[in-house]
Regions:
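Nucleotide-activated sugar donor-binding and catalytic core shared by glycosyltransferases
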Residues: 1-272
Length: 272
């Protein structure tokens, strides 16, 4: 492998942003395939203290705590222009990278919360036509947004996102976020809504996303058997309690700011 070649030619190498789980093969003391590669690194920078502790306990002496470089990559992109007519100073729920389970939780609630505007961005944009046919409320499509009259934009309850790459900026229009994937293959990016101060709700499959379980992050993890009523309770609590929403927005921004700087820490150590 690559690290074997690097060791053979005496080329130093380091590993950034490792996150080790209990029981991982690289921690086994009798693993002659992986341990030489990892112990041969000059530095192995870990995302969390828990990961570093497991590393050190396994006998490695090259571990360092750096933090998570994803926090440095997530940017606070400005909201797209022209959405003010649609949002209309109303609370906005952004449903990001949704799969069918998240949509099944949401769709029955659209009539129940008439004051709520929804930006709905499915993970698979080819499903937009199918989703469109299921919506019981007026909607507009993002790709054609400028072609709608201002009346249609204002009347729409749902903005269907049928393009790729715009979701990070659309989070800037929101107040709450339902992030998809965690009832199925695994959680999608929750740092994008958090950087804009949105409290997040998601499913339970959050392995590999330590930030979803961090007590300092305003993230609510729903059980696998969640129903529309479960989601309704979460939404209602925040719509009826703006101070809670503001508190969670501040919490999210503090959480992001606290964990920035990992890339700089790696660079500073390697520059010594």
């Amino acid at each position: 492998g690559t690290t074997a070649m690097l060791r053979k030619h005496h080329i130093p190498y380091a590993v950034a942003f490792a996150q080790v789980k209990p029981g991982a093969a690289k921690l086994w003391p009798w693993n002659p395939w992986e341990r030489p590669s990892w112990s041969g690194a000059s530095h192995v920078f870990h995302q969390t203290e828990e990961s570093l502790a497991l590393w050190t306990r396994a006998g490695y002496r090259n571990g360092f705590l750096a933090g998570d470089g994803r926090f440095d990559q997530v940017g606070q992109r400005p909201a797209p222009e022209g959405l003010e007519v649609f949002t209309d100073h109303r609370p906005v729920l952004v449903v990001g990278s949704s799969w069918q389970k998240e949509e099944a939780l949401l769709l029955p609630l659209l009539m129940r919360f008439p004051e709520l505007k929804v930006i709905l961005a499915p993970h698979d944009v080819s499903r937009v036509d199918s989703l469109d046919s299921q919506l019981p409320v007026p909607r507009v499509r993002w790709s054609k947004f400028e072609s709608y009259t201002s009346e249609s934009q204002a009347e729409a309850r749902v903005l269907l996102v049928d393009s790729l790459g715009d979701l990070p900026a659309l989070y800037a229009c929101g107040h709450l976020a339902l992030v998809g994937g965690a009832f199925g293959p695994g959680l999608h990016n929750i740092l994008e809504p958090l950087v804009h101060g949105l409290p997040v709700v998601c499913g339970p499959k959050v392995q590999g996303h330590w930030e979803a379980s961090d007590s300092e992050a305003p993230v609510t993890i729903l059980p696998m058997d969640a129903t529309p009523e479960t989601l309704a309770t979460w939404i209602k609590k925040r719509l009826e309690n703006p101070p809670l929403r503001f508190k969670e927005a501040e919490q999210a921004k503090i959480f992001i700011a606290k964990h920035r700087g990992a890339s700089q820490r790696v660079w500073e150590v390697l520059s010594l």
